[in-house]
């Protein structure tokens, strides 16, 4: 049986992940899921190791006040993912959390494939991140067509799937037509 760990860090990521996972579940019944998610993934019957609300902070002061809690959650999340030993870690948005976790998972178990949905806006700011992302991401799913050229140039394997709010037409292979 294949295993996928779904990693989200905020409600919008939970919503997007649930849309992708619901499509996968209609095509494949031989996949075991585990997550850090919220209500949308739970509605699909996917167990979560903790609710993403435990790591969702908006204000900078909230992040500072909870810095050590967040670091502990990152460590605990990595350990739970490694214990689950998925074939794929599917991380969604929230790059400051999900990509930190993904990097640590890849360092500890390079066999786990890491697919990230919603590219960080490295083409707009903090461009140096893309070089680090190439070290641990196996594939990235893109919202905007112009991102494809950028990530192709950076030699990061990618697929343009489109923006869920702009276009709901995604085929069974998660490629926008």
Which stretches of residues belong to each language-model region?
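Active-site and donor-binding regions of nucleotide-sugar-utilizing enzymes
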Residues: 3-176
């Amino acid at each position: 049986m294949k295993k996928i760990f779904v990693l989200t860090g905020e409600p919008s990521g939970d919503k997007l992940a649930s849309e992708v996972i619901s499509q996968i579940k209609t095509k494949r019944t031989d996949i075991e899921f585990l997550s850090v998610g919220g209500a949308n993934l739970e509605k699909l019957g996917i167990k979560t190791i903790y609710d993403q609300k435990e790591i969702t902070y908006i204000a900078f002061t909230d992040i500072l006040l909870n810095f050590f809690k967040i670091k502990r959650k990152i460590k605990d999340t990595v350990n739970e993912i490694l214990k689950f030993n998925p074939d794929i870690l599917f991380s969604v948005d929230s790059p400051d959390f999900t990509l930190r976790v993904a990097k640590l998972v890849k360092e500890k178990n390079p066999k786990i494939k890491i697919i990230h949905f919603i590219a960080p806006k490295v083409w707009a700011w903090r461009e140096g991140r893309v070089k680090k992302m190439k070290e641990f991401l196996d594939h990235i799913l893109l919202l905007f067509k112009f991102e494809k050229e950028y990530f192709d140039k950076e030699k990061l394997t990618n697929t343009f799937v489109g923006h869920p709010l702009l276009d709901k037409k995604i085929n069974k292979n998660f490629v926008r037509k």
